[in-house]
Amino acid sequence: MIGAGPAGSTAAYTLASAGARVLLVDKAVFPRDKPCGGGVTLRGARLLPFTLEPVVEDALDRLDCSLRYRSRFRRRAAGPLAYMTQRTRLDHFLLLKAAEAGAEVREGVTVDAREVDARIVIGADGCNGSSAKQLGLGGGIVHGVALEANVPYDARFAHTMVLDLAVIHGGYGWVFPKGDHLNVGVGGNASEGPRLRTELRRLCNEHGIDPDAAVDTRGYRLPMRTPETTLARGNAAVIGDAAGLVDPFSGDGMYEAFVSAQLAAAAALDVLSGKAAGMEPYAAAVTRRIAPLTTAGWGAKRAFERFPRTAYALARLPPSFRALEKLLRGDLDRPGDARGMERGAMRLIYAVARAAA
């Protein structure tokens, strides 16, 4: 397992728990930080066989949303929609879980002359890693960009997911509360890179946050797969960000990291037991589980790019929020599974997405 982020550690945990011999390697020494909003939807957290409570810093049950800082609406869910964590703590926690399950962990290692024999290789070293290329996988990945920073804590934002849609073409701005600070950021299409710093300052100003108090300002890429992306070949596969498994609209990759890790682990166990000849069934499983959400994400992204007012007017409808709430909590597998008025709202949003295609 190359890379001990959420995807790599989850896959290592799953495999080791099933009795497989697993070597998990990473160039970093943990705990280490990663630029990321740090949110884990309840949908994602429910995938894990253990609780994330030890590293949760806030539980978000409120949505505060605007279109370019105007027409703001607020909604409150019946329960948590997402948990806020810091990657320093979350990733180390997941790594320790993998080690406790029996995975051999090697930190602070880079490519050198040592050789390791393995029946299966899984690349989980993120969008900046080299495993996909070395394994002849990946390709066809479209990148978005984001810029984030940390600012002093403000109780006004407790338990609240603040989203300012379309402040960046193809994306949004956010304010996420952590235990002792706020994470603020903006992200969108790669072409928006030169505007990110200016828009981050504006985001802060719009919410009464001092932009000069921002620290740890960092940029990063958001990898999004396309149908041309190869996820597996023979006894090799890529998962998580290394596979471009980031939602095109939300930019969330944590749910996809956990799902792809578990699907890859299941496929690997089939290979090890002789039930399968290679890891290709993993790619098919990703298509079944994640592709419908990815397709919906691309549709929502295009709708807000081309028809932002119409898309926003539909998104703020109470049935739309109820459908979103169920998706974030994992009570709906995909938007098309909505029923009643929620289904009607989703169909209207789909219609706008098709018109924007």
Annotate each predicted stretch with a short phrase.
Residues 27, 31-65:
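N-terminal FAD cofactor-binding segment of flavoenzymes
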